[in-house]
Amino acid sequence: MSKLNMTPREIVAYLDEYIIGQKEAKKSIAIAFRNRYRRLQLEKSLQEEITPKNILMIGSTGVGKTEIARRIAKIMELPFVKVEASKYTEVGFVGRDVESMVRDLVNNSVLLVENEHKEKLKDKIEEAVIEKIAKKLLPPLPNGVSEEKKQEYANSLLKMQQRIAQGELDNREIEIEVRKKSIEIDSNVPPEILRVQENLIKVFHKEQDKVKKTLSVKEAKEALKAEISDTLLDGEAIKMEGLKRAESSGVIFIDEIDKIAVSSKEGSRQDPSKEGVQRDLLPIVEGSVVNTKYGSIKTEHILFIAAGAFHLSKPSDLIPELQGRFPLRVELENLTEEIMYMILTQTKTSIIKQYQALLKVEGVEIAFEDDAIKELAKLSYNANQKSEDIGARRLHTTIEKVLEDISFEAEDYSGQKVTITKELVQSKLEDLVADENLVKYIL
């Protein structure tokens, strides 16, 4: 199945493997992502006219808002970035400006394209690395040797390469030249400052500067892999493709958008810069040009998905212009006790499967009785009702509490099968959940 060519039905079927319920949210987002593919099949002139229908997801924390968008972007291999609206400040104030989310998207897009190109050249890179190490391990031939000696050397080199590829010489030490570690650049500063940073680095830190290091063959493989990748890859083409892909199929997920909404009830007491952040966000969502270190990017074809719990405010508390830029609205359901149980038993990589896999490393086989799983779901649901509702995240902490002693004393249980019963779950959690003063500690 072509990943970008997935139909809405296929997208929802994929999401069902990891996320229980939330049918309406899955359906809306599947259609929005499919429309990205449909648009790219049209004539260039018509493509420009069709802008994505941005989505506003409304639901409590832990119900699957981020996971739905992240999973689709991952399976379809689209540039994706998740940001939190509350982390941004109005232009003129100290803090991150909203344009940095677009720069983050472009960085992720370039990295995505680079990894794809590396995967295509994987065998070629591997061969070049092995050849370089083999030539280091095998002394070079002197000048003027006979053809027979040259053939013998070629055969020896081939055998050496085979041994390196099979890992036979991984522990042998060799001295190689590797590039000095590059200086990290802060990509969240404006492009003008980025260019100054890059120019200073070129002056004080020449790329060709190398240092000699003694490494094991295994370590040398990794060190040389990055260096040889850079020589084989077309950096400029990767940057251009990354920029283009971010522009045409990028996805920005803005979480906690309710935190920058100004409630009509408490408007005068709230941070006045919240509305300023909304107004700064507006041109980016509507469509504008943002300068990045890779070049300029137009934002009108980026898909924006905003999400928030809206406990203390309403979507209507956002400025009208911003509301209008998120025409599709989806309300996600709170998790019931039954859904909690299904999350533990029916998802492809459920929390239970994760803990079983982790403890199997120590030789401990963990089995959960069905009644124990139901009790976990029940107590997690009750904790959500009595304290702040954090959705499925509550399951992580309740299971962690139940398995805490077994995880700590894992070596004592090595080679054994441990069965988690309803009684064990109750003994670990019931007193904690029953006491409203203690329930807040089950995060």
From Swiss-Prot:
The protein's name in its UniProt record: ATP-dependent protease ATPase subunit HslU
Localization (cell): Cytoplasm
Domain of life: Bacteria
UniProt GO molecular function: ATP binding; ATP hydrolysis activity; peptidase activity; proteasome-activating activity
Record note on quaternary structure: A double ring-shaped homohexamer of HslV is capped on each side by a ring-shaped HslU homohexamer. The assembly of the HslU/HslV complex is dependent on binding of ATP.
One annotated GO biological process: protein unfolding
Family named by the database record: Belongs to the ClpX chaperone family. HslU subfamily.
Function: ATPase subunit of a proteasome-like degradation complex; this subunit has chaperone activity. The binding of ATP and its subsequent hydrolysis by HslU are essential for unfolding of protein substrates subsequently hydrolyzed by HslV. HslU recognizes the N-terminal part of its protein substrates and unfolds these before they are guided to HslV for hydrolysis.
InterPro entries: AAA+_ATPase (IPR003593), ATP-dep_Clp_protease_ClpX (IPR050052), ATPase_AAA_core (IPR003959), Clp_ATPase_C (IPR019489), HslU (IPR004491), P-loop_NTPase (IPR027417)
Alphabetical list of SMART domains matching this protein: AAA (SM00382), ClpB_D2-small (SM01086)
Record organism: Helicobacter pylori (strain G27)
Principal subcellular localisation of the protein: cytoplasm
GO CC field: HslUV protease complex
Pfam families referenced in this protein's UniProt entry, alphabetically: AAA, AAA_2, ClpB_D2-small
